[in-house]
Amino acid sequence: AFHNYLRERDIPWQVEDLAGAHAQVKQLEHELEKRLSAPDAPELICSVFAVGSEVVADALVSTGKAGQVMVIGNDLFPESALALRRGIFTNIVYKDPTSLAYRGAKTLGDYLLWGRTPTVPVQKGAVEMVFASNVDRYCELAGI
């Protein structure tokens, strides 16, 4: 959807999707370090999962690029909050996991116990952007 959005609006950004999920962390780490060391290194990195955020922070530090590349990390946890405070990340995308878990459990319970199917097949939750200026408040809310 993101690539289509850019194409439809003629936005001239070059976007690279790097492979690497939980089972491919070393591959992601290698690819990131290679890209960050290249002459045409990325100007912005967006991570879409918590482990990826950790890998991005580590790669930025190991290549000496921390604070030189805009980075949007994903999920608020102690290491991502520290990366934001230290200027390694520019922002963090925050999704309230307690609220999402509650809604998921309720939806599943309603289905299993009462046979009620959800009114919409995909439920969406609020997404908030955390900045260095408000990270302490979000950490307090999240119990970090």
Where are these regions (language model features)?
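Class I S-adenosyl-L-methionine
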Residues: H3-D10, A57, R85
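A structural micro-motif
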Residues: I11-W13, G67-V69, T90
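Short, surface-exposed amphipathic charged segments that create phosphate/polyanion-binding patches used
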Residues: L32-E33, R86, G109
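Structural signal for conserved beta-strand scaffold positions within catalytic alpha/beta enzyme cores
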Residues: D17, G73, V93-Y94, F131
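Hydrophobic alpha-helical
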Residues: F2, E16-A81
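Hinge/cleft segment of the Venus flytrap/periplasmic-binding protein
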Residues: Y5, R9, D96-I144
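Short beta-strand elements at the ligand-binding edges of bilobed clamshell
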Residues: A1, R86-T98
